[in-house]
Amino acid sequence: MGSPNKQGSHDCHGAPLGKDEIAATRECIGWPHAPFEIPAEVYSAWDGKARGATFEENWNARFAAYRAAFPAEAAEFERRVMKRELPANWAATKAAYIASCREKSENIATRKASQNALAALVPAVPEIFGGSADLAGSNLTFVKGSKGVTRSEGGNYCYYGVREFGMTAIANGIALHGGLLPYTATFLVFSDYARNGIRMAALMKQRQIMVYTHDSIGLGEDGPTHQPIEHIPSLRIIPNLDVWRPADATETAIAWTCAIERADGPSMLALSRQNLPTVTAKASDADIAKGGYVLADCDGAAKVTFIATGSEIKLALDAQAALAGEGIAARVVSMPCTNVFDRQDAAYRKSVIGQAPCVAIEATHPDFWHKYVGTNGAVVGINRFGESGKGPAVMAHLGITPEHVAKTALASTGCMRETPRMAAMPSRRRRAMRLAWRALRSQKRGADART
């Protein structure tokens, strides 16, 4: 509007008007002032300092009266909105809940572990405000203590309907308003629909927790339309987004507490549909909270280091045991949040990864992990879409097995040369084994070149 020759056309969108059209526009709207000259009457109309000071003075007076009439509510408002602090009993609540997870040592899906965490933490942190995109029963995000928002009544849980982007954008608005800590939920594969809202939460440094369940091909018969492949790697590279993929109930509890405590950005929890065993009995809370740590070390120097997350941690432990039977020492690193791990100091990161060749294991696209394993390591992942079938069968079909992990470690790192069993073999058999090892190395290089 106002550009006599370009208004109503695409020429006004994304391109300068040009000297002649600017002059014509000035004449059209009656603007005689020089460029960057702001008339005094316009400046005074837009200068909000004096008016703002009056508004602030009036608000402070109203809040003082409110505090006198409702001291408890005013203190809660100050804590949540003005100080942005968690409740005074938060540290004790957190420690007690994590300890209870360790005592139970349950084999449960991490989505169920997340539900248990919410049930314990929502009453302790009343500003938590949940919701799901029509999948509350599958995401397990509606817990005892949740109350759905209706047209006539308030609550702490919103049924957003099948609109992942709308849900995420609304939660961003709730976070920007202050006083509430929103979490949202859907299947991980549907994060594609929420992508811009996720990115904006990270860009604006807003506290939102995204609960994304059914995190891999392990979900089973829903098939490739519902089985995420590229999603976790692509979400990890969004700046300022912490992506957690916990391996058991304890890692899930710590992921939740870290997400609640984070003040400068959003967090995402990728959670399993299938049950997972307890694997962190000996891991410390502090190490897990660092995003990556040595879960199971070996005696002496490791010949290979396995790095895994979530449901693949058990595979790494089984592969470690298989290699130990061959006399090959392996270390297992659990890395539930690469983003948090990368923020640790260099000395800590080096102490966890170690000097041995690395094999990363995750039922996602493999490309992300090459920055950790380098050119001398390998990645056991999936660079194709999934299949419909029972979760374990699909995992086996796509090579996400302890046997394939151990085989990859042998083929990729040269560990086979070190095997004591080989040293005891007749020379002809040793030569045959070395030829097989070289063939595996060649096959691995060819696969790397193709991906």
Model region roles, listed by residue range:
Residues 1-44, 49-439, ...:
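Thiamine diphosphate
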Residues 448-450:
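Short, intrinsically disordered C-terminal tails of secreted or membrane-associated proteins
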